[in-house]
Amino acid sequence: MEANTVGKEAAREYLDRPRRLQHGIENKKHKIVALRDLATRTTAAISDMPRSDSPNLQRMETMLCKAADLEREIVADQVAIDTAKEEIMAAVFDIEDYREQQVLYHRYVECQAWSAVAEACGCHIRTAHRFHDRGVEHMAEKLSHSGHPKNT
């Protein structure tokens, strides 16, 4: 029983890669906005405190370089998302049951909420959860027989 639970958890992690990568992209986008905001601030803090001996004279340049680096990471992450979705689609469509395929597709490839998954599949949320659980079991079996695909 425990091995089955571990297999199902590994299958869920495998299927959830695009969603995790998308959250990482959103975090990086927020960081870029914050960095650009810091870089373009023109107000100087007026204080009677002494200045440091070595002020960062390239503050704006440093912030913009960090933002550009994050933008490059986002492009690489988007490629990783697309690759993961292609792998997941191929694995999902290898499952025999059409309803399980549809639930897994809408949940993990389209990254839809449960209510949207149920609506797209024309069933109640509880029924979508049942198809999901069976689909994840079948995915775990496939992954255990073929060797677990590399998580990136």
Model-derived features: positions:
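Short coil/turn residues that cap or connect secondary-structure elements
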Residues: V92, E96-R99, T127
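Helix-turn-helix DNA-binding module
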Residues: E110-R126
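Short, well-structured alpha-helical interface segments that form or flank functional binding sites
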Residues: E13, Q112, R130
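Alpha-helix N-cap/helix-initiation sites
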Residues: I81, Q101, I125-H129
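Short amphipathic alpha helix immediately N-terminal
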Residues: E96-Q112
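DNA-recognition helix of helix-turn-helix
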Residues: G122-K142
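N-terminal interaction/assembly modules
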Residues: M1-F93, A116, E137, E141-T152
